[in-house]
Amino acid sequence: MNTQVQAKKSVQPMTGPEKIIAKACGLPSVAPGDFVFPIPNMVMVHDNVLPSIKKALDSIGIDQLTSPEKVVLVTDHEVLYGSPRAALYGATNRQAAKAWNVGHFFDVGRGGHGHIFPMEMGLVSPGNFVFDNDRHCTNVGAIGAVGFRVGLEISRVLATGTNWIMVPHSLLLTLKGRLPPYVHARDLGTHIGRLIKLGEIPFDLDYKILEFAGDLDQFSLAARVALCSTPTELGAYGVFFPPSSAVLEHANRVAKSPFMAEYSDPSAHYQMRAEIDLENLEPLVSLPGGIQNAVPISEVAGLSIDHAFIGSCGSSMFEDIAAAAEVLRSRKVSSGVRLFVVPGSEETLKRLAATDLMQVLIDAGAVVLPPGCGPCNDAVVGPLHSGEVSISTATNNNHGRFGAKDAKLYLGNPLTVAASAVAGSIIDPRHL
């Protein structure tokens, strides 16, 4: 069923995200710097903050939400209750979902990662506006939506149906050429961070929307998710891909309600523009302390590892894990290395089980965990002890993210992580 409706011509040149914000506000147009109150299509809250939000609303006598049908409550940060506190949070979250009569509650084993499965299930569509408590809501830019983090002010959205925002400025990054084999969108994301750090792309992403343009048809929804998850670690407030025909086909197939995709006008204003050539890009690894600390993999090849993790809201869709599984096929995880694989959604888990890829992962010695954040949530599962070395597809590698503060956290693409788990040391997947 085609659920897309015809977009209206804007009254002044606007970017796609500006059109989405204007539409959510019921305004003919918006401009950077405007203070507005968008009405979201979806409101997302995850399990780790929901108890404090419920307590805050209870304390001021709010026991009903303005638009409960738009609310999505997700258990993804602590799927495996590793402590009595986690079990208490789970019970509190179930009570909140029932008391508020929310439209969508995805408890343990029901949905997966909140920044992944709503796009797979059609809860978020092109042209939608989303409020979220978590910064990785930038992922919805992969499907052509806009997601803004409001932190604990999500309680105000739940109570009143909206919250103020200042319309951000937009930056346009044009991608030229095609990614070489074994180079993943994650590599491109870290490359962007590296170029910004070096000053070769003079972008200040703080409270900006980063929009992609250029040779974009090569990027699947999974690749777009990988690219949308990275800039938020560099300060971006939003990320946006204009929907491709393939993305629109997916959205039309799964959308739960009519949607209207938005595209930037040719004469739309951007605070700054830049271009990147993709043809000579190679696999990169981010050194501990920040994704922008990226170097060619050759500079760290041979470094022994203890731990590997494939997952997170940046690299946990079926395409990501399938690519890693093919690297692992007929191979074994090196002795002394523990490899965790965390699918991003129940849908991905089912697809892996429906093929031989789940068996490939098991035969290789990987530990497959339930869909969710996995170790990326401050290592509530699979932590590192002092001095251990990890390579993963986590969204960041800040010191202490996976447990011990002196553990060394390296980031790579799913193929690099899988190959390194087999080799027992960081290795270019092209050389395994």
Regions found by a protein language model. Name each.
Residues 1-432:
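Fe-S-dependent hydro-lyases/dehydratases of central metabolism
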